[in-house]
Amino acid sequence: MIGRLRGIILEKQPPLLLLEINGIGYEIAIPMNNFSLLPAIGQETILYTHCIVREDTELLFGFIKKPDMILFRALIKINGVGPKLALAILAGMSEKQFLSAIEHNEIHMLTKLPGVGKKTAERLVIEMKDKLKGTSKSLFSLATIGEGLAKTEIEAITALISLGYTHQEASKMVKKVAIEGANCETLIRDALRTTL
């Protein structure tokens, strides 16, 4: 699976982005609110990605922030929520607002999102609560305490959370091995070694 891409922006035609990597143009669907965060055409960008392969097509979805990708993956596992609706949800409210709406059973907030009716909102609350028991607070924490950490440390913590560790466990593991200039892969590998 393609998990991350770095390339030059060739075209922006919301909701699609054309990214050139080694002479190949990748068409990537991204949340509408991510377009304002992208650099100009001709500039380089990095996207976290999720690839869906179907019988008749291959779809690539991109996200500027890794927690958005994690939330997207959780959303598309819910019955009745496809990739397009998941993108609309991510574009309609911030990750923090969405997780708060789930945590506090705010059905009325969710029904304001395009394509989300009352039944879908209720299903989101029920199913997402179970999926996010260990990660909702973790994702909140990453959004609020990220300022004090290097980008690679935040990415490593997010990756460890997606592997099933709590935010507290992941933070401790990364802090034990964090050194200036280390890349994300090194931090993750070294952090996982601390558990052996």
Swiss-Prot record:
Region annotation (Domain I) ranges: 1-64
Gene Ontology biological process terms in this record: DNA recombination; DNA repair
Cell compartments where the protein resides: Cytoplasm
SUPFAM superfamilies hit by this protein: DNA helicase RuvA subunit, C-terminal domain, Nucleic acid-binding proteins, RuvA domain 2-like
Pfam families: HHH_5, RuvA_C, RuvA_N
UniProt cross-references to HAMAP family, sorted A to Z: DNA_HJ_migration_RuvA
Protein name in the entry: Holliday junction branch migration complex subunit RuvA
Organism: Baumannia cicadellinicola subsp. Homalodisca coagulata
